[in-house]
Regions:
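N-terminal Rossmann-like dinucleotide-binding module
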Residues: 1-45, 168
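Beta-loop-alpha module in the N-terminal Rossmann-like domain of NAD(P)-dependent dehydrogenases
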Residues: 16, 46-104
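Hydrophobic residues in well-ordered beta-strands that form the structural core
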Residues: 52, 89, 114-116, 140, ...
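A contiguous active-site-proximal alpha/beta segment in oxidoreductase catalytic domains
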Residues: 94-151
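Mid-domain beta-loop-alpha active-site segment that forms a flexible
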Residues: 117-124, 147-178, 191-192, 303
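Contiguous beta-strand/loop segments that form the cofactor/metal-binding neighborhood of enzyme cores
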Residues: 165-242, 276-292
Length: 306
């Protein structure tokens, strides 16, 4: 078991604390928060130590879990890395690319592992169809949320859209050719609604929309590729696959005839979705990568690129 500590005891921080306590891979030693009262309350609730300083905590742990506002990610991560501590950082990894690039360099220099909390990579609706995604040529994502003041320290791109950016970058094996985007601030001081079009060198195009001032919640991504359409509902944890398959013997849901007389058999399927906790899965995945000296599934490079 890895000795773990959590910095940040807010809403999401307490979720991480609870799950680290549940995991067989971690021994949660304690927590730290700038607000000592919040730290003591969380420590009492979860039966662990409330550290009086961040420096005291990183001297005793193997793994640091950073669940604080984005602006503080870099300073906490840098101190931990320089102390030889492996780091899990909630997304976005940093406030800017200069900071994340420095963490990339420091992690290599100090031989520690960093995983970034792009939790949708562990969403069972995505993992159920991940192996079906192959050379998509058009991708469309919508991530809409009702307003919540948590997360408004950064734009909707770093708050919400970054999840879909990471999913798309992990699914398209091609460099980016061009990005065009627009955004507007509605309530907060940073953009609350944004749209981006990402063009890849292999011809794939991704269109992303994110809003945190919506009347309803939605987290859907659709992949279009040769002979197959894949739809993922991250919110409701459902996936659908529609594909053309001439080799199947089952009765298709429909048969389409092209202008030249060719008949295409269309099949529909809904994969079984597991009931796993995606945050617990990503934390356990990080423990596996440390134990086996493997690259984390969502490492610092992925966080930096997103």
């Amino acid at each position: 078991m890895f000795k773990a500590g959590v910095v940040g005891c807010g809403h999401l921080g307490k979720i991480h604390i609870r799950l680290l306590n549940q995991s067989d891979n971690f021994d949660l030693l304690g927590v730290y928060d700038n607000d000592v009262n919040i730290s003591k309350k969380a420590a009492s609730e979860f039966g662990c130590k409330s550290y009086g300083s961040f420096e005291e905590m990183i001297d005793e742990i193997d793994v640091l879990d950073i669940v604080t506002p984005t602006s503080s990610h870099f300073s906490y991560a840098l101190k931990a890395i320089e102390n030889g501590v492996n780091v899990f950082i909630e997304k976005p990894v940093c406030s800017n690319t200069e900071e994340s690039l420095k963490l990339v360099e420091k992690s290599k220099l100090n031989n520690v592992k960093i995983q970034v909390g792009h939790v949708e990579r562990f969403n069972p609706a995505f993992t159920a169809v991940e192996n079906n995604i192959s050379k998509p040529m058009f991708i469309e994502s919508h991530r809409l949320a009702q307003f919540n003041p948590r997360g408004t320290d950064v734009s909707v791109v770093l708050d919400l859209m970054i999840h879909d950016i990471d999913i798309i970058l992990s699914s398209v094996d091609s460099p980016i050719k061009q990005i065009s985007s627009s955004g507007v601030s509605v309530i907060s001081d940073t953009p609350d609604i944004a749209n981006a079009r990402i063009e890849f060198e292999n011809g794939c195009v991704a269109n992303l929309t994110a809003s945190r001032v919506s009347l309803k919640n939605m987290r859907k991504t659709r992949f279009f590729q040769s002979g197959k359409y894949i739809s993922i509902d991250f919110l409701n944890r459902e996936s659908e696959i529609v594909e053309i398959d001439e080799k199947k013997s089952e009765i298709p849901i429909m048969t389409l005839e092209t202008s030249d007389g060719n008949k295409k058999k269309i099949y529909f399927s809904k994969p079984d979705i597991s009931e796993n906790n995606a945050i617990l899965e990503e934390l356990n995945s990080f423990a596996f990568s440390i134990k086996n000296n493997k690259r984390p599934k969502v490492d610092i490079y992925d966080g930096h690129n997103a």
